[in-house]
Swiss-Prot record:
<comment type="similarity">
    <text>Belongs to the beta/gamma-crystallin family.</text>
</comment>
<protein>
    <recommendedName>
        <fullName>Gamma-crystallin N</fullName>
    </recommendedName>
</protein>
<dbReference type="InterPro" id="IPR011024">
    <property type="entry name" value="G_crystallin-like"/>
</dbReference>
<keyword id="KW-0677">Repeat</keyword>
<feature type="domain" description="Beta/gamma crystallin 'Greek key' 2">
    <location>
        <begin position="47"/>
        <end position="89"/>
    </location>
</feature>
<feature type="compositionally biased region" description="Polar residues">
    <location>
        <begin position="169"/>
        <end position="182"/>
    </location>
</feature>
<feature type="region of interest" description="Disordered">
    <location>
        <begin position="153"/>
        <end position="182"/>
    </location>
</feature>
<dbReference type="InterPro" id="IPR001064">
    <property type="entry name" value="Beta/gamma_crystallin"/>
</dbReference>
<dbReference type="GO" id="GO:0002088">
    <property type="term" value="P:lens development in camera-type eye"/>
</dbReference>
<comment type="subunit">
    <text>Monomer.</text>
</comment>
<dbReference type="InterPro" id="IPR050252">
    <property type="entry name" value="Beta/Gamma-Crystallin"/>
</dbReference>
<dbReference type="Pfam" id="PF00030">
    <property type="entry name" value="Crystall"/>
</dbReference>
<feature type="domain" description="Beta/gamma crystallin 'Greek key' 3">
    <location>
        <begin position="95"/>
        <end position="136"/>
    </location>
</feature>
<dbReference type="GO" id="GO:0005212">
    <property type="term" value="F:structural constituent of eye lens"/>
</dbReference>
<dbReference type="GO" id="GO:0007601">
    <property type="term" value="P:visual perception"/>
</dbReference>
<feature type="domain" description="Beta/gamma crystallin 'Greek key' 1">
    <location>
        <begin position="6"/>
        <end position="46"/>
    </location>
</feature>
Length: 182
């Protein structure tokens, strides 16, 4: 089972001003806690978090790590709306991701054990991925720069199997926890 903990503080105003909401675990609806859905700055005290622009963990996702985010335009130029968040489950230090060119784990396969800013630098010639196999937890970004459009890849969100079990799911344009193509 994944360990999910941490602390994130959301602020209504830029540069950590205005009403604030401190969150220590899953928060499926900010309005239920008396906080409007406008978030202009964030302080991640501990853990990594996935934040969603709609309640109930839906919509565009933002992966935020430890640190300060004083102005939403620096991490989300689309909108200051945010409706829910949850800590990213951690299975320790072990993570592995395999991407496949074809459906059902066929075709060219590329394995990742660490951060990689460009698929092409690792020999991936296609502009899409059809199948992803995840061992542990991770995050991916599209297009080519870290932090552009991001989505979470997590076995802990798919099953309660141990970290050694892989979650396998075909990549489509909008599966539950993947919001963009690679």
């Amino acid at each position: 089972m994944a360990q999910r903990s941490g602390k994130i503080t959301l602020y209504e105003g830029k540069h950590f001003t205005g009403q604030k909401l401190e969150v220590f675990g899953d928060c499926d609806n900010f309005q239920d806690r008396g906080f409007m859905n406008r978030v202009n700055s964030i302080h991640v005290e501990s853990g990594a978090w996935v934040c969603f622009n709609h309640p109930d963990f839906r919509g565009q996702q933002f992966i935020l790590e430890h640190g300060d985010y004083p102005d939403f335009f620096r991490w989300n130029s689309h909108s200051d709306h945010m409706g829910s968040c949850r800590p990213v489950g951690m299975h320790g230090e072990h993570f592995r991701l395999e991407i496949f060119e074809g459906c059902n784990f066929t075709g060219q396969c590329l394995e990742f054990l660490e951060d990689s800013p460009f698929l092409q630098s690792r020999g991936w010639v296609k502009n899409c991925v059809n199948t992803i196999k995840v061992y542990g937890d991770g995050a991916a970004w599209s297009p080519r720069s870290f932090g552009a459009e991001d989505f979470q890849l997590s076995s802990s969100l798919q099953s309660d199997q141990g970290p050694e079990e892989a979650t396998t799911k075909p990549a489509t344009t909008q599966p539950p926890f993947l919001t963009a193509n690679l």
